[in-house]
From Swiss-Prot:
Pfam families assigned: P-loop_SecA, SecA_DEAD, SecA_PP_bind, SecA_SW
SMART domains: HELICc, SecA_DEAD, SecA_PP_bind
Lineage of source species: Bacteria, Bacillati, Bacillota, Bacilli, Lactobacillales
Keyword rRNA processing included in the entry's annotation: no
Entry's localization field: Cell membrane; Cytoplasm
GO MF: ATP binding; protein-exporting ATPase activity
Stated name of the protein: Protein translocase subunit SecA 1
Length: 799
């Protein structure tokens, strides 16, 4: 362990040395650039762009570009980045995390790598945790970029698609993390390419990177829509299906006649309408062609009603309890609480059983921040606290944490923790300390872990007659204002879990002489990082300050991980002695080792989440890639559709022609051909009994080719044909992908229940997920084949 730590430390030093050399180069250009006129300095931007076009790299022009942005900042913002800020900027350019203490000017530091990377014209995203900070930074720092000839955009939740597109087309775009993620998902749901708003993800600098990539890492972004099927549709389909008769005739009976309306193939648990059944459906619903493109939703309902009524067996596959359909686990025979079949099958069973059909919202697209931000070509981040999570940043995001030295030595005093036996005695002591410091005018910031603690403390301060402000993360703009005033003489501010990150606490007049800002933590958070954030609010830029944590044996963390040694202290304190107090570095160490254990557990959970998510990520990339190919195509999708049709023919014919010819499942073959490839008349003329499986496939390929040619003739305009092809593929892909997301979610929930025996749940999930994905692709190809081959051509199709 010691060796690993030494290696990390040495690597940190080595990187820092390299960055310091570069910073010296940047500083050495300072005098020369100071002498340039505004016009000459502004002319640097087109000059750099030209040099990049001619083959120079960003690394080649870094010293000059940084010197340009630095001099520009002095002229436009009245701020001149210090040497440590240049080093921080270099760390960011190389895709690292710059750990910079609060008040060291992270926002200004970012301007240097943002300017350099924006010169490529491929876009730089500056990512913040809320829209207030995005707007603030865009209006303040944006002045500098605009002055240097770059375009700057702000991406807000309230904007229209056109406004968003304009923002993303800028050289520099300010946005929140959630808006970036949702825009990415929405872009992969559009049906026309010009509806997309984002460009390829190039370079992002994330402010408060630990908050976004670690605290919110497991939060999935989800776009969901009400499942569009109305309940009445399930009932309509159910009523129709209940009138049908099963065709139980043997496949050996070769009379080309249907002996019922539907046929079940029990080995594969598939069920299909026969030609007789298709005719009945057309009569029942008043249709000319059941498989026309407009009837896709109805066909889906009929398919599910058939499965619900004739394949899914009551008291074997499911039970009905208290008016609800409950799934039975085929492995254990137990009822699975809260689980539902996906793809509308559950509603179809509810219709069959005459119970209330439950509305369902459907996840249409989803991604986690972990997977979204890993798609950027280059990623960097800034925060005051990342070192404790260094391993996670390296392993998951391939980013090193570089601790940037402070501009001035730290003068803050971090006092040892104080431990009280009870919550009451602890809060009384906190109020006493606030009172003493407030009496002499020293500003106090009190950090609490939970809102209820802040309310309790606020009540006690009211009783003590101490005016104070309470902060919780509801109103970001108001929050910033309160935090800005927290360093004024006599200010007392209570903040929950570091609301107000990203806003500096500057000391008011005469506060330095009083000892700077006093920070009091009312309990330790389970993450050291959050505690360090609270501490870091005091002592900015070499200011004086003091911090201390007050703990009690009734605190959550102490109860969970207090350790035996702390309990010994408790025994020494008699029951009635509430005033007994322990102040010791040992307590601090004990708490920190408890925090390390929690952090380790949390990291393992996030890592596991990512391993599961990676299965979905691979699948999402394939589907989104295919979708993009479809909406970007400007000539013909025949090279995509025709192979789909051929693979469907191969798959279906292979499935039903195994073994000797006498074992062929002729009824199923006929049903497939007449429902998905051609009409009943042509199916009869095929004379299958004289064909081998390969000959039959070739005949069907030819029918498909002829059908394609016929449709191309009907739609003489190639653009209309392309539009028709796109409609077919997009409708099918989107419907099947949405169902697949749902099914994968169900699988993930059930997989933990399967973790019996020696099975590894993750391996089970990967293998089942892969099989389900293959099945989905096969279903997409089947649906696209049926939809394309059976559709009637009309002029006014819409996607």
């Amino acid at each position: 362990m010691a060796n690993i730590l030494k290696k990390i430390y040495d690597n940190d030093r080595r990187e820092l040395k390299k960055f310091e050399k570069l910073a010296t180069k940047v500083e050495s250009l300072g005098d020369e650039y100071e002498k340039l006129s505004d016009e000459q300095l502004q002319a640097k931007t087109p000059e750099f762009r030209k040099r990049l076009k001619n083959g120079e790299t960003l690394d080649d022009i870094l010293p000059e570009a940084f010197a340009t942005a630095r001099e520009g900042a002095k002229r436009v913002l009245g701020l001149y980045p210090f040497r440590v800020q240049i080093i921080g900027g270099i760390a960011l350019h190389y895709g690292n995390i710059a750990e910079m203490m609060t008040g060291e000017g992270k926002t200004l530091t970012a301007t240097l790598p943002v300017y350099l990377n924006a010169l490529t014209g491929k876009g730089v995203h500056v990512v913040t945790v809320n829209e207030y900070l995005s707007s603030r930074d865009e209006s303040e720092m944006g002045q500098l970029y605009k002055w240097l000839g770059l375009s700057v955009g702000l991406n807000l939740n309230s904007m229209s698609a056109d406004e968003k597109r304009d923002a993303y087309n800028c050289d520099v775009t300010y946005s929140t993390n959630s808006e970036l993620g949702f825009d990415y998902l929405r872009d992969n749901m559009v049906v026309y390419k010009d509806q997309m708003v984002q460009r390829p993800l190039n370079y992002a600098i994330i402010d408060e990177v630990d908050s976004i990539l670690i605290d919110e890492a497991r939060t999935p972004l989800i776009i969901s829509g009400q499942a569009e099927q109305a309940n009445s549709e399930y009932i309509r389909a159910d009523r129709f299906v209940k009138t049908l008769v099963e065709d139980k005739s043997d496949d050996d009976v070769d009379d080309d006649e249907d002996h019922g309306d539907y046929k079940i193939d029990w080995p594969t648990k598939t069920i299909n309408l026969t030609n007789q059944g298709i005719k009945k459906a057309c009569e029942h619903f008043g249709l000319k062609n059941l498989y026309d493109i407009d009837n896709q939703v109805l066909v889906h309902h009929i398919d599910q009603a058939l499965r619900a009524n004739y394949i899914m067996l009551k008291d074997i596959d499911y039970v009905v309890q208290n008016g609800e359909v409950m799934i039975v686990d085929s492995f254990t025979g137990r009822v699975m609480e809260g689980r539902r079949y996906s793809d509308g099958l559950h509603q179809a069973i509810e219709a069959k059983e005459g119970v209330k059909i439950q509305e369902e919202s459907k996840t249409q697209a989803t991604i986690t921040y972990q997977n979204f931000f890993r798609m950027y070509k280059k990623l960097a981040g800034m925060t005051g606290t990342a070192k404790t999570e260094e391993e996670e940043f390296r392993e998951i995001y391939n980013m090193e944490v570089i601790t940037i030295p402070t501009n001035r030595p730290i003068a803050r005093k971090d006092l040892p923790d104080i431990l009280y036996p009870t919550l009451d005695s602890k809060f009384e002591a906190v109020v006493k300390e606030i009172k003493e410091r407030h009496a002499k005018g020293q500003p106090v910031l009190v950090g609490t872990v939970a809102i209820e603690s802040s309310e309790r403390l606020s009540q006690m301060l009211n009783q003590a007659g101490i005016p104070h402000a309470v902060l919780n993360a509801k109103n970001h703009a108001k929050e910033a204002e309160i935090i800005m005033n927290a360093g004024q003489r006599g200010a007392v501010t209570i903040a929950t879990n570091m609301a107000g990150r990203g806003t500096d606490i500057k000391l008011g007049p005469g506060v330095k002489e009083l000892g700077g800002l006093a920070v009091i933590g009312t309990e330790r958070h389970e993450s050291r990082r959050i505690d360090n954030q609270l501490r870091g609010r005091s002592g900015r830029q070499g200011d004086p300050g003091v911090t201390r944590f007050y703990l009690s044996l009734e605190d959550d963390l102490m109860k969970r991980f207090g350790g035996d040694r702390v309990k010994l202290f408790l025994d020494r304190i008699s029951d009635n002695d509430d005033d007994k107090v322990i102040e010791s570095r040992m307590i601090t160490k004990q708490v920190e080792s408890a925090q390390k254990r929690v952090e380790g557990n949390n990291y393992d959970t996030r890592k596991q989440t990512l391993q599961y998510d990676d299965v979905m990520r691979t699948q999402r990339e394939i589907i989104y890639g295919e979708r993009m190919q479809v909406i970007s195509e400007d000539k013909s999708l025949k090279p995509v559709l025709m192979p789909m049709i051929k693979r469907t023919i191969d798959h279906q014919i292979d499935m039903y022609t195994q073994g000797d010819k006498k074992d062929w499942r002729n009824d199923q073959i006929r049903d497939f051909i007449s429902s998905a490839i051609t009409d009943e008349e042509t199916t009869k003329k095929l004379n299958m009994k004289h064909l081998s499986a390969e000959e039959l496939k070739k005949r069907l390929y030819q029918i498909a080719e002829d059908n394609y040619a016929e449709k191309e003739k009907q739609l003489a305009d190639p653009e209309q044909m392309l539009e028709f092809e796109k409609v077919v593929i997009l409708r099918v892909v989107d419907e099947r992908w949405t169902d697949h997301i749902d099914a994968m979610d169900q699988l993930r929930q059930s997989i933990s229940l399967r973790g019996y025996g020696q099975l590894n749940p993750l391996v089970e999930y990967q293998e089942s997920g892969y099989r389900m994905f293959e099945e989905m692709i096969s279903n997409i190809e089947f649906d696209a084949t049926r939809l394309f081959m059976k559709a009637q051509i009309r002029q006014n199709i819409s996607r």
